[in-house]
């Protein structure tokens, strides 16, 4: 059950929404995870601790950093809509990638799919995204040293419209 505890803690850290649900209804943890009584009590205590909000912020900052560093004009062009589209992206892809170019490339592909599906974004988004996505893709190709190249699955983006 330790694995379930660890997964629950990771999920809670990655999802402020899940933390809020658990604060209001701690039984959510028992419904989603196989926990001992002790593990459940610890997680409920962690979620209720004021520091948990900071843990969630740090997690999200780490997910946002590759985007802010690699596609800054796209982020700026999204303006106030950045928060909503990034939150949707994180919901669609709950597990980040520590390779900044892979994470940025995946977000670019996510946003490209939303644009292709008719998503409504400021006019500056499409040209900024096209320019920066090409730069990220080239940097990603140059940075990979694995025998098997990174190939994102197109099915990952089918439901992102």
Task: Label the model's feature ranges.
Residues 1-41:
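Membrane topogenic helices and adjacent juxtamembrane segments
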Residues 4, 48-49, 60:
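RNase III-family endoribonuclease catalytic core
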Residues 4-8, 25-28, 66-73, 85-89, ...:
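A general alpha-helix detector
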Residues 28-29, 49-50, 91-96:
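A short structural micro-motif
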